[in-house]
């Protein structure tokens, strides 16, 4: 479920030492399974533990996860990173916005999962996103770009060298990827 590095456990131990005895941490997702999902960590005193919580025991601490957040924290990583600029706690939860799908799920769901959990976070850095519109009978994934990708001069490169390569590698049953977005500059353009 969740992995907490030794460095992060040490960091939490220092913080927990200043709290009520028996206090541990709670890891949660607000708005799980939506584009607005946000992850967080808080203190979890003994009287805040719910019967439906899952407890994840680590070498130095325990983490409580509520029933609703649990599936969205699959493969989550919490680390405490120190470099020349200082230190920070990082929480990466690739499934927070969309629940991980099983390998036996329909192709459409598996492709959508990869787009939402791996490709869109990269495009979001430029204000963009991509949506799967359909998968044709002859194995083409039909995509539509939005946000900062709409009208971007790099969209062909992103499609062929990034998205298509990744999707074809993960899903050999796909034959290619096509873009149905109108990229000519106009009223619909993002910039």
Swiss-Prot record:
GO MF annotations, alphabetized: 4 iron, 4 sulfur cluster binding; iron ion binding
SUPFAM superfamilies associated with the record: Fe-S cluster assembly (FSCA) domain-like, HesB-like domain
Domain of life: Bacteria
Cofactor(s) the record lists: [4Fe-4S] cluster
Co-factor binding comment: Binds 1 [4Fe-4S] cluster per subunit. The cluster is presumably bound at the interface of two monomers.
Residues at which [4Fe-4S] cluster binds: 149, 152
Biological processes, Gene Ontology terms: iron-sulfur cluster assembly; protein maturation
Segments traversing the membrane: none
Stored Pfam families: Fe-S_biosyn, NifU
InterPro entries (UniProt xref): Fe/S_biogenesis_protein_NfuA, FeS_biogenesis, FSCA_dom_sf, HesB-like_dom_sf, NIF_FeS_clus_asmbl_NifU_C
HAMAP family given in the database record: Fe_S_biogen_NfuA (MF_01637)
Role description: Involved in iron-sulfur cluster biogenesis. Binds a 4Fe-4S cluster, can transfer this cluster to apoproteins, and thereby intervenes in the maturation of Fe/S proteins. Could also act as a scaffold/chaperone for damaged Fe/S proteins.
Quaternary state and interactors: Homodimer.
Record protein name field: Fe/S biogenesis protein NfuA
Species: Pectobacterium atrosepticum (strain SCRI 1043 / ATCC BAA-672) (Erwinia carotovora subsp. atroseptica)
């Amino acid at each position: 479920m969740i992995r907490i590095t030794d460095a992060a456990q040490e960091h939490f131990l220092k913080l927990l030492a200043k709290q009520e005895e028996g206090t541990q941490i709670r890891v949660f997702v607000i708005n799980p399974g939506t584009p607005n999902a946000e992850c967080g960590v808080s203190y979890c005193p003994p009287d805040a533990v719910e019967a439906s919580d899952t407890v994840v025991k680590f070498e130095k601490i325990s983490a409580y996860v509520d029933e609703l957040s649990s599936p969205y924290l699959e493969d989550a990583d919490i680390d405490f990173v120190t470099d020349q600029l200082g230190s920070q706690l990082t929480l990466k939860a690739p499934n927070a916005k969309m629940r991980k799908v099983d390998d036996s799920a329909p192709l459409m769901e598996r492709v959508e999962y990869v787009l939402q959990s791996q490709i869109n976070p990269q495009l979001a850095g430029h204000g963009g996103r991509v949506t799967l519109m359909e998968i044709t009978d002859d194995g083409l994934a039909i995509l539509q770009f939005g946000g900062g990708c709409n009208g971007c001069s790099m969209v062909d490169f992103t499609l062929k060298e990034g998205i298509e390569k990744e999707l074809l590698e993960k899903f050999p049953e796909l034959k290619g990827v096509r873009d149905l977005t109108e990229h000519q500059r106009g009223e619909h353009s993002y910039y």
